[in-house]
Every structure is written in C-alpha cells, then in structure tokens.
Amino acid sequence: MARYRCCRSPSRSRCRRRRRRCRRRRRRSCRRRRRVCCRRYTVRCRRR
C-alpha cells in the first residue's frame, strides 16, 4: 500500500482547506488531485 504525502507545504491549515475541497468534489476529482488531498482523505478515496 503506497502512502501519499499529506501536503508538501508545512502549513496544516492549508492542508485542511484542501482536504475540504477534495471532500466536496467527487471521487474522480479526488483521485486526480490526490497529491493535493491529505493522506487520510487520499486513502479513503482510494478505498472507494
């Protein structure tokens, strides 16, 4: 199981904001932007 890095930027707030954005979008979008999504969300998105 490959784990994706949460966010390259050290700011967590930015990561949360991006995770929210990913959460709102559909799976396909989330998959395409998995680099932007947080690790937890990416894993969830991947499972589905």
UniProtKB/Swiss-Prot annotation:
Q: Does the keyword Transmembrane apply?
A: no
The lineage's top-level taxon is Eukaryota
Q: Which gene encodes it?
A: PRM1
- Which family does this protein fall into? Belongs to the protamine P1 family.
Q: Name one GO biological process term.
A: chromosome condensation
Subcellular location, principal: nucleus
What is an example of a Pfam family matching this protein? Protamine_P1
Entry's Gene Ontology molecular function annotations: DNA binding
Which GO cellular component term is one of those annotated?
A: nucleus
This protein's species is Mormoops megalophylla
Known function: Protamines substitute for histones in the chromatin of sperm during the haploid phase of spermatogenesis. They compact sperm DNA into a highly condensed, stable and inactive complex.
Q: Where are the transmembrane segments?
A: none
UniProt subcellular location: Nucleus; Chromosome
Q: Which UniProt keywords apply?
A: Chromosome, Developmental protein, Differentiation, DNA condensation, DNA-binding, Nucleosome core, Nucleus, Spermatogenesis
In Swiss-Prot or TrEMBL terms, this protein is called Sperm protamine P1
Question: Is DNA-binding given among the entry's keywords?
Answer: yes
Tissue expression from the record: Testis.
